[in-house]
């Protein structure tokens, strides 16, 4: 649009309700509001100032119902209770540019798997697999299933079968997931030889637990566009009680972010590496015996 306007000296006018302190709208407000002689004019005003015909009673009722939201919706103030959960620098420093989008399974590595299940409509059904290496938590695989082009749904049973086969390639015979239809998930995954464990933490709590992993620089992510976008758009809200929560914004999604952070939390919660311990403190024969026992457990009928 802007290049075309250069030929006509036309104006580009944008109108919006302010929301979070990020993005193009906030950038224009921050850089140009109240600046004399600027070629960008930013006007800010309440709904009543721009439309005096609005009912005072209706506005007061909305303000009483949700004062925080009303300051944005009716007073045109950027919200102070919502902030970006992760800044761009933290996310960018975690991305391993140049690596394959998916890393193949390797022998001798213990993997964890986390799924964000979906009923096949709206949200994606996602799975993440990762491992610990050199004190860092690596997301090896991140996949999602969406409705096919032109359709509004997909088959969650077929997706579960596909993801269960993927998990087994990484010797993951148990996975962790959120509370979405936990009974259905447990039944569906068990049909394909994988145990589904419901996460003890909520999605928001998982995000908050992962924050120190990002700030310490011990997260390694694939250069996955959907994941990175969802991480950047996660919102951290401070409630009146003082408790923080993290979730996607209005009309947003966080299916890939949920799966990735879920497996990061699973890895950090079980960061004790038995193989490293045996290698450091036991004889080589003990290490080989332990590896054989793990292989036999994976090949047993109970684990297949």
Locations of regions flagged by a protein language model:
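Short, conserved "post-DEAD/DEAH" coupling segment immediately C-terminal to helicase motif II
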Residues: 1-10
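Conserved AAA+ ATPase "SRH/arginine-finger" region at the nucleotide-binding site
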Residues: 44-50
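Substrate-gating cap/lid alpha-helix
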Residues: 210-213
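RNase H-like, metal-dependent nuclease domains and their acidic two-metal-ion catalytic environment used
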Residues: 9-41, 52-204, 208, 221-304
